[in-house]
Regions:
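Extended beta-solenoid/beta-helix repeat architectures
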Residues: 104-106, 121
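Glycine-centered loop/turn positions within well-structured domains
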Residues: 49, 123-125, 133
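LRR N-terminal entry segment and analogous cap-like coil->beta motifs
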Residues: 13-18, 37
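A generic "structured core" feature
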Residues: 88, 92, 110-112, 116
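Terminal amphipathic alpha-helical/low-complexity segments used for targeting or macromolecular assembly
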Residues: 1-14, 132-136, 140-170
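Flexible, glycine/small-residue-enriched loop-and-beta-strand segment within the central core
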Residues: 21-31, 36-104, 137-139, 143-145
Length: 170
């Protein structure tokens, strides 16, 4: 992670990325704290990509800011534009999702695996599909009685394990 800090626009504390990870430029990518990116994440950051805190990204996700013209002559001239991507806090993005330029994903949203997000996603919303469509809204107060199946000891062991990985610059 120390190497990434030198090349990215900004990288929050306790954020983890599982290799391989790819960036177009890196300097246009800004990632908050306590985020997790699984294997094979791609950031084509021709325009800024801004990701909030506590964002969890499944394997094989892509953040694609470039835009390309439909006009043949513009393509022949290698014209390329770009639109920014913004992801709010506490967002969960399922594996294989593609987030296109010009999209803002609101806080607490969930993006279904394999979705292609072409339009803004409101906060507290679950979207899925190609193109991604609203499945339902999330009540932030609604929470299962037992949010996870692990004991407090198991959670502590997992946190210590990930802290060791981070300390070893994994």
């Amino acid at each position: 992670m120390h190497v990434l800090r030198d090349y990215l626009g900004s990288l929050g504390e306790h954020t983890q990325m599982r290799p391989p990870v790819a960036f177009d430029f890196g300097v246009n990518t800004h990632i908050g704290k306590y985020c997790f990116f699984n294997f094979n994440t791609t950031f084509l950051d021709v325009a800024p990509i801004t990701i909030g805190d506590y964002v969890f990204v499944g394997p094989g996700c892509q953040f694609l800011t470039p835009t390309h013209p439909i006009n043949v002559q513009d393509r022949i001239n290698f014209w390329e534009g770009a639109l920014p991507i913004t992801v709010g806090n506490n967002v969960w993005i399922g594996g294989g999702a593609i987030i296109l330029g010009g999209v803002t994903i609101g806080e607490n949203a969930v993006i279904g695996a394999g979705s292609v997000v072409t339009k803004d996603v409101p906060e507290n919303t679950i979207v899925a599909g190609n193109p991604a469509r609203v499945i339902r809204t999330i009540d932030p107060q609604q929470r299962p009685a037992h949010p996870h199946q692990y004991s407090e000891q198991e959670m502590t062991q997992a946190q210590e394990f990930y802290a060791r990985l981070e300390a070893d610059n994994f």
